[in-house]
Design a protein with these regions (language model features):
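Structured, helix-rich domain cores that form ligand/interaction pockets
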Residues: 1-171
Length: 172
């Protein structure tokens, strides 16, 4: 996202994925059409009403994952779910705070917003997760495969036990 838009706050689309890989391919002067994808991070920034950390307490356990609250001196800053095998990780955090702490650019339209980031990190075994022989770069922006990725991202969130009947709307 930062490579294409100059910041890591704007939500990335399927078209952005294609454009980013085309730009990378042009920059490196090599074709990435046969490149194998070995890691995938799927994320979205939700504009929420309250500070993002206030939502963490509504997210309970996730079967076969360790639930870890990332703590700082000001309280809970992030929520991590790491699979027992450490092949997958679900992460929730305040995207504006994270960007500001890294001293990265926050576009004016996002300043003073509550952006809750939900990120699914697939560290390996991507082809097994999606039941394909190989995941290549062009598959990431193929409409059917892209929709499978998004559906998987949603399904992983839905497996989290919700507490106090509150749920983040991920239907967009």
């Amino acid at each position: 996202c930062k490579f294409l838009h100059g910041n890591n706050i704007v939500n990335f689309t399927r078209t952005d994925t294609r454009l980013a890989f085309e730009k990378l391919s042009d920059t490196l002067h090599i074709s990435l059409n046969n490149a194998t994808v070995s890691r995938m991070d799927v994320a979205y920034n939700f504009d929420v009403t309250y500070p993002p950390e206030s939502y963490f307490y509504h997210l309970g356990n996730l079967p076969y994952y360790k639930r870890l609250e990332q703590m700082f001196y000001k309280g809970v800053e992030g929520l991590y779910y790491s699979s027992v095998s450490d092949k997958k990780q679900l992460v929730f955090y305040d995207k504006i705070k994270e960007t500001t702490n890294r001293k990265d650019y926050v576009p004016p339209e996002y300043q003073n917003k509550n952006l809750l980031r939900y990120e699914l990190r697939l560290k390996n075994h991507i082809k097994q997760i999606f039941k394909v022989n190989k995941v290549t770069v062009p598959m990431l922006y193929d409409v059917r495969f892209y929709n499978r990725i998004v559906d998987y991202w949603k399904s992983e969130y839905r497996k989290i036990v919700k507490q106090n009947e509150y749920e983040i709307d991920i239907t967009d």
